[in-house]
Amino acid sequence: LGVHGVTQPDGSTITLSNAALVWVPLLLLATVAAWFGMNDIAGSKASIRDQLPVLKRPHMWLLSLLYLATFGSFIGFSAGFAMLAKTQFPAVDILKLAFFGPFIGALARSFGGIISDRLGGVRVTLVNFVLMALFTGLLFLTLPGSGSGSFLAFYVVFMGLFLTAGLGSGSTFQMIAVIFRQLTIDSVKQRGGSDEEAQHEAVTDTAAALGFISAIGAIGGFFIPKAFGTSLAMTGSPVGAMKVFFVFYVVCVLVTWLVYGRRKSA
């Protein structure tokens, strides 16, 4: 439906759209596996009307903020890292190295969940946000600025950001599930509901919260590249966007500690 092939200065043709075809057999395989191997859980079905009440809970929006800072950072950095590196270090062929960041972040997500199950999601998330703020601060020192900068330092620090964004995605996801389940059970018990009612409503509310929060977290895929682009267009440097990210991560440290770290969510 779009342009089929783009002619390069040397006369050759590059067809980027063909790269997407590699996913076709994998998608077909996943479709067949899902059709024959997955089953719906009848007890977990809920209408949109049943799910909307979670939007009234303050924890829904606080946890959305934290998930935006982790998962949103992961997909946002994945989208904007190559562009940022190319503008700051044009002599480096970043296309050969850019994929390592998303790869590290994707692997780290599962480890974030595993570690959180053992040490607690709040503790892991808190430490993770401190590290994300630290890496963002270190990133300022690697940029060209008045000197030539250091691509090696820039790359290593950014890999640290990918790692922590991935770990945080797993730990905040674990937090959401644990916190909303307990909140719902406590709420049902307070109004005199049975254990069965509490468990059923907890499943519905937790699933709804995870769905809404995941959608909000995906905004980072747009916001971060846009922030870098706007900062570069206005000032010629990504420093403005990075300052915003640094402050954002510090705010997330405070929210995690003050709301969930010092006392039980209630």
Each predicted region: which residue ranges?
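A membrane-interface helix-boundary motif in multi-pass transporters
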Residues: 2-24, 227-249
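C-terminal membrane-cytosol helix-exit motif in multi-pass small-molecule transporters
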Residues: 2-6, 19-44, 255-259
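A late C-terminal transmembrane helix in Major Facilitator Superfamily
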Residues: 190-234
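C-terminal transmembrane helical hairpin of 12-TM major facilitator-type secondary transporters
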Residues: 122-172
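Helix-to-loop junctions at the C-terminal end of transmembrane segments
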Residues: 109-121
